[in-house]
Amino acid sequence: MGARAFSHDSIFIPDGGAESEQTVQAMSQDNILGKVKTLQRQLGKNIKFGQRPSNAIPMKKAGSTDASSEEDFVLTSPMEIVTQQDIVPSDTENKSSDTPSSSSPLNLPEAGSDMEEKVAPVKPSRPKRHLSSAGTIESVNLDAIPLAIARLDNSAARHKLAVKPKNQRVSRKHRWLAQDRQNEPGSFESQSSLDQNGQLGEDKHIWHGEEPEPLESHEEKRLHEEYWRELEAKCKRQKAEAAEKRRQEEQRRQALERRLWEESLRQELLEEEEEGEEEEEVKEEGEEGEEVGLQPRAGKVPPEEGHQSGPEEQRCTEQELGGADDPARLEAEERRREQEEAERQAEKLRQREAERQEEEQKQREAERQEEEARQCEAERQAEKLRQREAERQEEEARQREAERQAEKLRQREAERQEEELRQREEAERQEKLRQRDAESQEEELRQREAERQRAQEEDAKGMLQEEEEEAKRIEELKGKETPEPLVEEGPQSPEGESQPWLTDDADQRSPLQRDLEKPGEREREDLESAGQREIAEEPRGEGEPAEQSGDLDAHCGGVDGEGKETAQTDSPQPQERQMEGTPAPEENEATAADIDRKVEELRWQEVDERQTMPRPYTFQVSSGSRQILFPKVNLSPVTPAKDASLAPAAQEPPAPRGAASHALPSALSIPHTAILVTGAQLCGPAVNLSQIKDTACKSLLGLSEEKRPMDVPTVESRAGSGKSRPAPESPSNAAALAEWASIRSRILKNSEGDQRGDREPARAGDEPVPRARCDSRGNVRRTPPVNAKFSIMPAWQKFSDSGAETFRQSLDGESGRKKPGLAPSEETAPQPHAAAQQEVSQEPPDTTDGCKFAKDLPSFLVPGLPSPQKAASRTESTTTLDSETTSDVGNPDPAMPGGEEKASPFGIKLRRTNYSLRFHCDQQAEQKKKKRHSSTGDSVGGATPATGSVSGESEPEATFLKHGPSLPQERKPALSPRKDSAESHSSGHYVAVAQSGLPPASGQTPAPEQDRAVSKMPSMQKPALAPKPASQTPPSSPLSKLSRPHLVELLARRAGKLDSEPSETAKESSDNQPPSPSLPEELKGQKRDEKDVPEKKPASPPLPAGQQERPSLIPETGRKEKPVLQSRHSLDGSKVTEKVETAQPLWITLALQKQKGFREQQATREERKQAREAKQAEKLSKETVSVSLQPGSSRASKTAPVHKPAAPSEEKKPETAVSRLQRREQLKKSNTLPTSVTVEISDSAPSAALVKDVTKRFSTPDAAPVSTEPAWLALAKRKAKAWSDCPQIIK
């Protein structure tokens, strides 16, 4: 309203009417083109504005506002909007000069053709509609305009009133037909004029209310009429032109409609859906058209009424205009409606088509995407399929490959199994062949033994007289040297043993046979031999080193002249046998004792057979508790050897020895496979005995006639071990023992290196070591064989017995004999001891050779040459009671395999390396064995003291040495000995009784076992002899030898006596019988003993001290070597002891505590044992006197040491008790030690220290343990450090 009312066209200043008109026209002409402009210019000169009917403006306002508002709400399609635009600009053409593009008529002619493209002008039109709809005077901003309004001229108002009706009609037509007339120039003139008039009308209306319209003059009316006429003429022309244009436009529209209808036909479906909407739109548009038509009609009336001056003219003009306009307008409206409808439909079609196309495009896009997705999915699926196929093929290929591999493996496995079967079959065939060979050899041996026995019987008859004489001498000697007879007995066996082995075995077996046949004769013979040994050993005790060397040399020579020695030994033994036969009372006693012993041996043999049934032993080789080197090592005892040996042993004592040796041949291998130093390998059968050609080896192994002597020599070697006593045996016996030692050492060496080439030199070199070893070994061997189920041996000794295969065979011969009974074990020990002692005196350095340290497993010592092994064992045993113990233990271990150890494999445990061999045996059997050994130790200990009352001190000392050196062995027995107050005695007794008891169990072997036990007893008595050796350490080794053979005889007799006398020995021997079943426990006991050995070894070292005094020459060298061994092999008792004690403070403390109790027990037990031993010692001393007389110089040398040891033996007895206590402590330690812990052998170092303490111990046996404890405690502490370092070292 404001925009129209106050547009420049409608404002006139009254003073300058024409000027204002011109100004207004000029302003409006900017937007007016063509004819309209010219018409306005022309009219502007003539038109005088006068008042128009006031109704015109309201009608106009109402029409324009209502129409615009209706159109705002009703118009929906683009065509309608365009129409609205065309209409509104026609009304507001002059007013909206600001928007020429929308209001300018120039744009309108193109609306028909470009209908679709003129949607944009809607926006300018709507603001105009808004203004028009809002048009009220109040809403107009009149701040600056009221002055102009006040100055408006009447002519302008009149002109407006005059022009308004037509203007309104034209504008209404234009509203209806704007689209039809868009391109018609005539319409623009009418529009512009109508707009002007309309605006003027509006303006006039405004001031019409303000002031009354003055009446126009006549002239003005005339001019006005002229103006209207001209205007009408112009309008007609314009209408004609517009009609023409409309026709043209209508044609175009029809063509467009045809096209649109054609499109609509194509989209009938869409049209049908939207017909309802279209019809509604058509109705709405019809209504709009009607309303629009009403508005022009309504607008007509007021102007007609408004004409006051010229109604007729106006009517004419209106009629003309109406006549001209109505048909055209109606046509135009009809065409417009049709066109609009067509356009709307075409637009809808286009929209629908566009939507359809867009939808189709979307669908196509979606389909394309879906197709792509499907393709991708298909590709993925195909890829997956390909992958799965490839995987399947690969899997099939893998399966095929796996099947091929499995097939290959199966084939290889089948081939391997076939190969194994073939190998097993071959091995079985070979084993059968070996067994047949062994059986044939055993048969030969049995025949030879029978011949020997017959010869021995003849000799015995001849010897009865000599024995009677010797019995007298023995009786005289008994009071002086009880241990000497023991030693002599041992020597006799060793003598016969070492001489021709056959002769020695014959001698020993003849004593055993005599025991079986003529116990009295045998006893006399044993007494004579013992007496001779004692006599020879006493001198030896003083000049032991030289005597030993001589003996060793003699033995070497004896080895060379084995037959000679055999003859010599045979002759002395027959004499002894005659002497034995002479003393009827003693012979009767011996016979009774032999009978009892045989009975018990049979029992023991049965027990041993049961226990030694080939029970495979499994043990672990472990480094510490964490690293297990070999989780399960199986040691399977050789049943044939054991059975053969046990069966023959059961048959007769002499035969048993032969049987034992035979059993070994039948076994063709060591009773138990030996663990090599590597620990990884298990030795198979040492050698086929049938393959042994060397007579010495055969004699050692009992493969030849000497095999029987071998068995006896084993005992005799023990007798030799106590060479001081073997002196009574006579040089022949000494030579035989030396020969034995050299042969054995050589065998060991040969098995290690030049088995036979080195024998002679080895003999010579090793014999000194053997003496030293024998001391320790004799001691160690004595005890451990009984208990040792599992013996810890120096590698050299172990291998000397079991490590060196040749020596092992010899040991096997021995241990074969020993297998029948524990005595064989001890036999093995004594022989090595005898040989070792001789070798020690002769060749201490060989000890070093004997112990070769395995580099791969430092815990195991590789056996050196046989002699070096013995020498090493000697040296180690002498130098280190520990190593001695180890060696002894080693021998006993093999011996035990022979006897009790049949059930128990022998292994080496070295504390330093922390490698342990765990032997798993029946706990019950072990416990039984332990009980036996403990009881046996007591009875044997008692017997030993009784026998060694004279040699009691030396015997306890020797026993201590035994316990020290043989602590490994004694550790086992010593365990019981510890329990037994007198440990050395208990160990000695234990060994002796166990052996004597076991000999009964083993029947024939029992005799050798008894001899061995006797030899062990002499070893215990050997301390008695050892006292001299204490001054001379080597003598103690002879003492151990003498005491062993002597103890063997003593135990043989004592076994009878113990069986007859105190049944305690029998009980103990029966206990020993259990020990064989309880070998595992014995081994445990032995381990304990061995563990205690460090403690006891200090005590035993005093004996070594005594021994060292004698063997000091050799033992010192041996000791020097022993320390090397200790450092090298950690076998040295000192280092081992250190390790044991230091490594295990707990067990050390426990061992110390146990030592106290054991010392007390030992004191009481030793008292009892000494009482028993005193009696036996008297008998043995008498026998020893006679025997020592017979043995000749060699026996004299042996006997001299024996006699000397007799006194020291008493001293040593207290020390033996001390040593027993110490040993027990060590055994306790060993007991406290973990079973898997490597058992230390710790005598050698303590022996050196003990040498210093020996005098103290001798003087104060009870105090000796105290002095010993510090030494071994220090060693133990050092060992503890070593132990702590062991795992790292091992790694």
From Swiss-Prot:
UniProt key word Phosphoprotein = yes
What are the disulphide bonds in this sequence? none
> Does Zinc show up as a keyword for this record?
no
Compositional bias segments (type: Low complexity) = 580-593, 875-888
**Annotated segments matching region Required for interaction with actin-capping proteins:** 324-560
Tissue expression pattern = Expressed in the small intestine (at protein level).
Acidic residues bias: start-end ranges: 270-291
Q: Which UniProt keywords apply?
A: Cytoplasm, Phosphoprotein
Q: Name one Pfam family in it.
A: DUF4592
Q: Name one GO cellular component term.
A: cytosol
Q: Where in the cell is it found?
A: Cytoplasm, Cytosol
Basic and acidic residues compositional bias, start-end: 201-221, 302-318, 326-461, 470-483, 506-527, 534-543, 594-612, 749-778, 969-983, 1056-1070, 1081-1098, 1117-1141, 1157-1182
Spell out which residues are annotated as carrying Phosphoserine: S7, S28, S132, S493, S510, S636, S867, S1037, S1076
The domain of life is: Eukaryota
Q: Which GO terms describe its biological process?
A: epithelial structure maintenance; maintenance of gastrointestinal epithelium; negative regulation of barbed-end actin filament capping; positive regulation of actin filament polymerization
List compositional bias (Basic residues) regions by residue number: 159-176
Modified-residue entries (Phosphothreonine), positions: T482, T639, T1033
The segments labelled Disordered in the record are 48-71, 84-137, 159-221, 234-253, 267-663, 701-1238
Polar residues compositional bias, start-end? 184-199, 1183-1197, 1229-1238
Q: What happens when the gene is disrupted?
A: Knockout mice display adenoma development in the small intestine in an age-dependent manner. They also develop pulmonary lesions resembling early small cell lung cancer and solid-pseudopapillary neoplasm of the pancreas. Tumors from mutant animals show increased expression of Wnt/beta-catenin target genes without the alteration of other signaling pathways. Intestinal tumors exhibit disorganized and decreased levels of F-actin.
Quaternary structure?
Directly interacts with actin-capping proteins CAPZA1, CAPZA2 and CAPZB; this interaction decreases the binding of capping proteins to actin.
Q: What is its biological role?
A: Involved in epithelial cell integrity by acting on the dynamics of the actin cytoskeleton. Positively regulates the actin polymerization, by inhibiting the interaction of actin-capping proteins with actin.
Q: What is this protein called?
A: Capping protein-inhibiting regulator of actin dynamics
